[in-house]
UniProtKB/Swiss-Prot annotation:
Induction annotation: In culture expression is high during mid-log phase (2 hour), then decreases to nearly undetectable levels in late stationary phase (16 hours). During infection of mouse bone marrow-derived macrophages (BMDM) expression is maximal after 1 hour, when the bacteria is expected to be in the phagosome.
GO molecular function, one term: metal ion binding
Binding locations of Mg(2+): 12
Organism: Francisella tularensis subsp. novicida (strain U112)
Source species, domain of life: Bacteria
Residue spans crossing the bilayer: none
Consequences of knocking out this gene: No effect on expression of bacterial lipoprotein FTN_1103. Bacteria are as virulent in mice as wild-type bacteria.
Protein name: CRISPR-associated endoribonuclease Cas2 1
EC class: hydrolase
């Protein structure tokens, strides 16, 4: 059983300060910024709950976010530009974040 599961997180946050705080926090959780407001990576249930609390406490009614489970490391991308084959394969279950 994997301790961490693979997620894709995307957001649209108006306030620059809030957006910067969220960006830095997601990096601190070991997620990879695959675009400016899109993150991919593996998180534990506790980390996922902390990320949800971060969004709940930081977002306003005009902001948007979605978090979804993905399985990108095992499947071939239908189309991509600017990403190589290793972009979504660099995580080690027993490595460090």
């Amino acid at each position: 059983m994997q301790l961490r599961k693979e997620y894709l997180i995307a957001y649209d946050i108006e306030d620059n300060k809030t957006r910067t705080i969220i960006y830095k926090q997601l990096l601190a959780y070991g997620l990879k910024a695959v675009q400016k407001s899109v993150f991919w990576g593996y998180v534990s249930i506790a980390e996922l709950n902390a990320i949800k609390r971060l969004f709940d406490s930081s977002l306003t009614i005009s902001d948007k976010v979605f978090i979804t489970r993905v399985n990108m490391h095992e499947q071939k991308l239908d189309y991509s530009f600017g990403y190589d084959d290793k972009t979504f394969k660099d995580w080690d279950e027993y490595g460090h974040i």
